[in-house]
Amino acid sequence: MLTVNLIMIAAICLTNFFYQYLDFMRVLKCTCSAIFTILGAINLVYAYKTKQSNMKFYVSMMAGLFFAFLGDVLIDWQFIPGAAVFALGHVFFVIAYGFIQKIKALDCAIGGSVFVACVIFLFSPLVTFDVPVFRIVCLVYSLIIASMLGKAIGNFVRDKNKTTATIAAASFLFFFSDLMLVCDWFIGVWDWAPNACMGTYFPALCLMAFSMFVKIVSDSNKAEKR
């Protein structure tokens, strides 16, 4: 199963390279998204077949991956529906993180600090919203992604293991990718922003899907030692 994960991750990275090299062909973007969604589904089935005890985590992660895929399809067509679907995917990721550890004060403190930084950035003169509702969408989205990052970091701080490390890394890349998306859409002066956005977005989703496999292996090893 590790081989399957690595092959599919390599396929995503290769497709992502050509997606950016060929001037962001939409079909290649959707292909990348489809692959990480399929990888998540494979790991979900593997978790079920190996009778993992915390199936709610895997189902929530799969839901997050699916809505990320759907958001990829929608956001190039309509920004607000696409962002809404992405936000829903992030909510499922936060829920999944909560099935690893319950929400603690540290998670809220980290997430709150990140959100405050996002608010300051979104109201700075650098960022221009031609349509006012876009600012509201970005603020709501920032609250969700900040909560996601805060929970991931909090989980890792309390319990440093391969699963929480993988998820924390994925969440950070996700946050950075979203930041670059805002820079590309609402600042638009950095030519490298689209590449930075997609260059970190798909690796983030790869790690999200891969974290499901990492947790399966980790929990199975713990069960064998008992």
Task: Describe the role of every protein-language-model region.
Residues M1-R226:
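Polytopic alpha-helical membrane-helix bundles and their juxtamembrane interface segments
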